């Protein structure tokens, strides 16, 4: 009764201006993006929508997932996940791989290590934890997701060069 409101504090994650372009690039390339976070799913979905993620309104609270079957259904149906534990992140990566997907995982924290280790390609941010950087296949020195299209292009170039070289050996 004796309290007086003196102000409000508003905090938000800033979405970079180029985020919609980057997400658009991945959509054009046929890359299925998943946003997996330990944060509140409504908050994660709102940020994903501001960034321009297609189907950001399809989100799931991981605390409601209790069986492997529920997890498999969720990871194939939803694009955004909140309140995800490190073990669940690993399980999601494993299930995507079991469903024939090639999985690249980005992360920066200790909570991402299990999933990074499970992924086909793991990408850590240079400003992230040492644990994430040590387990990752690639470390983004600029800690900027905007570098990802360049990584995808380089990876595809390597794969194409290997195919070309292999076909020369098989033909001759």
What are the residue ranges of the model-derived segments?
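Membrane-embedded transport module
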Residues: 51, 55-105, 109, 119, ...
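A short acidic Gly-Thr/Ser loop motif
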Residues: 38, 109-110
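Conserved actuator
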Residues: 37-44, 50, 125
């Amino acid at each position: 009764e004796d309290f007086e409101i003196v102000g409000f504090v508003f905090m938000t994650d800033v979405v970079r201006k180029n985020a919609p372009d980057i997400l658009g690039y991945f959509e054009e390339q046929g890359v299925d993006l998943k946003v997996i976070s330990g944060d509140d799913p409504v908050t994660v979905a709102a940020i994903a929508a501001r960034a321009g993620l297609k189907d950001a309104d399809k989100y799931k609270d991981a605390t409601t997932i209790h069986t492997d079957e529920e997890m498999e259904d969720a990871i194939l149906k939803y694009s955004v996940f909140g309140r995800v534990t490190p073990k669940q992140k690993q399980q999601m990566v494993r299930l995507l791989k079991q469903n024939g997907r090639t999985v690249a995982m980005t992360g920066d924290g200790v909570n991402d290590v299990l999933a990074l280790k499970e992924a086909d390609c793991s990408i850590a941010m240079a400003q992230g934890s040492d644990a994430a950087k040590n387990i990752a296949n690639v470390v983004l020195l600029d800690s900027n997701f905007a570098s990802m299209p360049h990584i995808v292009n380089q990876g595809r170039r390597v794969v194409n060069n290997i195919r070309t070289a292999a076909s020369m050996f098989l033909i001759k």
